[in-house]
Amino acid sequence: MVAVKALLFACTLRTCVFKPCCDMAIFLIFLNAFIWSSSFALSKSAMEAAAPLFVTGSRMVLAGVVLFGLLLCKRESLRLPRPAIMPIVLLSVIGFYLTNVLEFIGLQRLSSSTACFIYGFSPFTAAFCSYVQLREVVTWKKLGGLSLGLVSYLVYLLFGGSEDVAEWGWQLGLPELLLIAATCLSSYGWTLLRKLGRRCESLSMTAINAYAMVIAGVLSLIHSAVTEVWNPVPVENPLLFLQAIGALVIFSNLICYNLFAKLLRSFSSTFLSFCNLVMPLFASFFGWLLLGESFPPGLLFAVGFMVLGCRLIYHEEFRQGYVLTSE
């Protein structure tokens, strides 16, 4: 029953996306960020029940199959144009497979709020990817905003955000590096998806996501079979695994991935990444609610400075016409 309601909710969201100049579109962006921020806590719960690569592959394959089923019910075309084959494969490997594998491995030793804050680096990587892939101009005003936000980001990341200021220290370890790599690859993937949506209008964003999820899921399961112990499957708590995977598929893969992809037709990936800077606050809430994690007091300060820095960028985005334009 919950799954049916969530799917109906996702369909309702999709009908509202193509009104880029109304308040509803902005509301959907922040609603999407609120829902998506729960995925960090849900992912940690899933990894308590099963191996990380198996979790990644299972959710991706299941979500892709569900999306294909929805497309078949709507009788949408699933034929891949020849020019779209290699970009979709590239999107699958970089934007879905590598991003999710690195994220899940890094999450094993990071709190959900810290991991989500590291993903706050995405506006900067998205701006760079948009410049390289879409030839979107980066002005001096944008660079100033990037610099201000980047300084705030690095101060928090390197010196920590623990409750006791005296405990702050160098905290750039392997988990943080994995999450940073996942952030960069994610930004590249979203920019590639936006570029692909422009070039292949005959193929819906949902269909592109479905293909990418299935391919990435199969790669993750193969990776899991090679590196993780299957006896018969790498699941320790089947009930918790099914609950966490079900929630991840519905909220992250079916609702958030597809809504974000739809929004990319009307907003730049840089602007959407900027709006997602509120996600660490939401993730802290879900981490407290679902996992009993404490709220790091330095997080609010760091996010505030990142938002101030990024405001400079988005004044330029509006002026240049990259935001709130129909495509």
From Swiss-Prot:
It comes from the Bacteria. GO terms for cellular component: plasma membrane. Keywords: Cell membrane, Membrane, Repeat, Transmembrane, Transmembrane helix, Transport. The chain crosses the membrane at residues 22-42, 53-73, 85-105, 114-134, 143-163, 165-185, 202-222, 240-260, 271-291, 294-314. CCCP treatment reduces SAM intracellular uptake by 50%. It is found in: Cell membrane. It is a multi-pass membrane protein. Coiled coil: none annotated. Pfam families: EamA. Belongs to the drug/metabolite transporter (DMT) superfamily. 10 TMS drug/metabolite exporter (DME) (TC 2.A.7.3) family. PANTHER family: INNER MEMBRANE TRANSPORTER, S-ADENOSYLMETHIONINE_S-ADENOSYLHOMOCYSTEINE TRANSPORTER. Transports S-adenosylmethionine (SAM) and S-adenosylhomocysteine (SAH). Allows bacteria to acquire SAM from the eukaryotic host cell and to likely remove the toxic by-product SAH. This is S-adenosylmethionine/S-adenosylhomocysteine transporter. It comes from Chlamydia trachomatis serovar L2 (strain ATCC VR-902B / DSM 19102 / 434/Bu).
